[in-house]
Design a protein with these regions (language model features):
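PAPS-dependent sulfotransferase catalytic domain
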Residues: 1-181, 243-248, 252-288
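Hydrophobic alpha-helical segments and their boundary regions
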Residues: 6, 206, 234-237
Length: 288
């Protein structure tokens, strides 16, 4: 039996830079002039919610409101995804790396490694709210819900859980080769950040290719693509997928109470990953 440990997961909570990362990697690795636009990223990466793979795994069109049916078909769909290319390849996921109802959502026997992207929850909350067509308080509730899920119209799901549990599930997964990238570091020090990622992939960085890939996938250019071409991955009801692409928007978009709630829920994880925000958010919450 052939070794199917071919998937390099591009994992994140929604609105944490996954599309940006997929675009950047496509622009770096694909031949000049052949990198796909944002609506054709599936030419370079796959996703674990692809309807065609679930249909094939189900031996017919997959559609079900039941989590049990999704769990029944998912392992077969992931095996098909893993075997769809001869070597290692990137697969997007928003699922936690956990056992769910006795099943590994990220099967070790199909996994070569993972790139995990995270974004500070203060900026994530308003962006996630737009993604969910919800108000910010509702988005924060979902970020705090251990049972939070998203799904396609046909019932192919993303098991999100809480924001902090999501991070923990990936960065503490036993035996998983992983590399963690902060959204904020991509904004402020992209060349250095991507070089670290490429070295994790055992790829010697090419400075010229890297500079071109970073320029081609700047937030301004991705937003321009969405304006000109639309974006097929944008959820119904969401006006724009690429809204601001900045760090620190929480200062203008969150109330003191919302900042306090996020701090209260996620403080240990903030201390680990965003210590630079602790004092400012503490003062902001008190000032309300």
């Amino acid at each position: 039996m052939s070794d199917l440990r071919r998937i390099i997961w591009l994992a994140s909570y929604p609105k944490s830079g996954n599309t940006w990362m997929r675009s950047l990697l496509a622009n770096y690795f694909m031949p000049p002039g052949q990198a796909p636009d944002i609506n054709n990223l599936r030419r370079f990466t796959t996703a674990d919610v692809r309807q065609d793979f679930f249909d094939k795994a189900n031996s017919g069109p997959f559609s079900s409101p039941n989590v049990a049916d999704w769990l029944r078909v998912r392992p077969k769909a992931l095996a098909l995804i893993a075997g769809s290319k001869p070597g290692t390849h990137f697969v997007k996921t928003h699922c936690q790396a956990v056992r769910y109802e006795g099943q590994d959502l990220i099967p070790p026997q199909l996994t070569a490694g993972a790139i995990y992207m995270l974004r500070n929850p203060f900026d994530l909350a308003p962006s996630f709210a737009r993604h969910q067509s919800a108000d910010i308080d509702t988005a924060i509730e979902r970020m705090c819900n251990p049972d939070a899920m998203m799904g396609t119209d046909t019932g192919i799901r993303d098991a999100l859980g809480r924001w902090d549990d999501h991070i923990r599930s990936w960065v503490e997964a036993p035996g998983l080769p992983r590399h963690v990238v902060r959204y904020e570091d991509m904004l402020t020090q992209a060349p250095q950040t991507v070089r670290g990622l490429l070295k994790f992939l055992s790829v010697e960085p090419n400075s010229a290719k890297l500079a071109k890939a970073i320029k081609a996938t700047s937030f301004k250019n991705l937003k321009k693509q969405e304006e000109e071409l639309g974006f097929t991955e944008r959820p119904d009801g969401m006006k724009t997928f690429f809204a601001k692409g900045q760090a620190g928007v929480w200062r203008d978009e969150l109330t003191a109470g919302q900042v306090a709630r996020i701090r209260e829920e996620f403080l240990p994880t903030l201390e680990n990953w965003y210590p630079e925000l602790l004092e400012e958010t503490k003062d902001f919450a008190k000032a309300g």
